[in-house]
Amino acid sequence: MLLAVLLQSAAAAGLGKLGAALGAAIAVIGAGIGIGKIGGSAMEAIARQPEAAGDIRMNMIIIAALVEGVALIAIIVCLLTLFL
């Protein structure tokens, strides 16, 4: 009986670490894809309207920072899940 309880707790701890690692990986992949799409769209917009390059670049940096902030929060939540 005690062995079964110990094995279940060990398995639960291992799955928690796996889940935290997968969550962090998905957050980073999502942020990379999002920032890549933002950069690509901004370059297309600058190619179409070179005179608006300053405004487009400013908006691109702000949106990329927001996407990166969401990814950072997701990684922090995964780390908290891992260690707490």
Curated annotation (Swiss-Prot):
It holds the Pfam family ATP-synt_C. It is found in: Cell inner membrane. The chain crosses the membrane at residues 21-38, 60-80. GO terms for cellular component: plasma membrane; proton-transporting ATP synthase complex; proton-transporting two-sector ATPase complex, proton-transporting domain. One of its GO terms (molecular function) is proton-transporting ATP synthase activity, rotational mechanism. The record marks E68 as: Reversibly protonated during proton transport. Keywords: ATP synthesis, Cell inner membrane, Cell membrane, CF(0), Hydrogen ion transport, Ion transport, Lipid-binding, Membrane, Transmembrane, Transmembrane helix, Transport. It comes from the Bacteria. Its main location: membrane. The keyword Cell membrane applies. It is a multi-pass membrane protein. The keyword Iron does not apply. NCBIfam families: ATP_synt_c. F(1)F(0) ATP synthase produces ATP from ADP in the presence of a proton or sodium gradient. F-type ATPases consist of two structural domains, F(1) containing the extramembraneous catalytic core and F(0) containing the membrane proton channel, linked together by a central stalk and a peripheral stalk. During catalysis, ATP synthesis in the catalytic domain of F(1) is coupled via a rotary mechanism of the central stalk subunits to proton translocation. Key component of the F(0) channel; it plays a direct role in translocation across the membrane. A homomeric c-ring of between 10-14 subunits forms the central stalk rotor element with the F(1) delta and epsilon subunits. Belongs to the ATPase C chain family. This is ATP synthase subunit c. The lineage of its organism: Bacteria, Pseudomonadati, Bacteroidota, Bacteroidia, Bacteroidales.
